[in-house]
Amino acid sequence: YVDCNDTYAYDPDAAKALLEECGYSAEELTFSMRLPKSYKEYVNAGQIIADALGKVGITCNVEIVEWATWLDEVYTGRVYDLTVVGHTGRLDPITLLARYGSESSENYFNYSSDVVDGLIADYRGQLDEEKRAEDVRQIQEQLAQDVPALYIQSPVMVYLADAGLEGFVQYPIDIYEFKDVKLQA
C-alpha cells in the first residue's frame, strides 16, 4: 500500500488559480454528477463535492438515478461527467487495480496509460512477490499522478462479536473469510 492521501490537498484558492492557468474562468465550467439513489453515502458525498465545486465557482448539477440506470448508463454506457460510487478491494490488489487497464471492461473511467497497462501485464506474468509489490506501488503512484479517479473516503466498519469467537480476521476491505472461525464455549 502506498499512502497517496496527501497528494492533493483541499485548497479552493489553488483550484481557482489552476483553472485560470488552464484558461478557464470557473463560471464557464458546468458538470453533471450522476449518483445512484439506493446508496445514501454516495449521494451524501456527491452533494458535498458539488458544494465544494460551487465554492470555486464551478456549477455541478446533481442527478440522482436508480441503481439500474446508474449501472446501464454510467458504469456500462459511460454517460456521465462525474459520479460517486464505492469500490471494494480483494486480497490480491491487482483485482481492483486491473480495472484501470485500457482494455478492461470495468474501466468506466475511460483511463488509458501505457505505463499502467505494462505494469498490470508485468504483475500478472510475475512470480516474484517483491517485484509484484513494486509493480503495485508503481501503479498506485501513477494513478495518484494521473487521477482517473479520486478516492475520498473509507467508511468505518464496526464489528461486534462474542468473546468466545476465535479466528475472525478483519481486513480493511469488504472481505469476510470464515474458514478459520470458531465459537468456543
Residue positions per predicted region:
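Short, solvent-exposed loop/beta-turn-alpha elements that line the ligand-binding surface or hinge
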Residues: Y1-D13, Y24-E27, V74-V79, T95-G125, ...
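Alpha-helix N-cap/loop-to-helix boundary motif
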Residues: T7, E41, V62, E66, ...
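Extracytoplasmic/secreted envelope proteins and their assembly/folding machinery
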Residues: P12-L19, V43-G46, A50, W67, ...
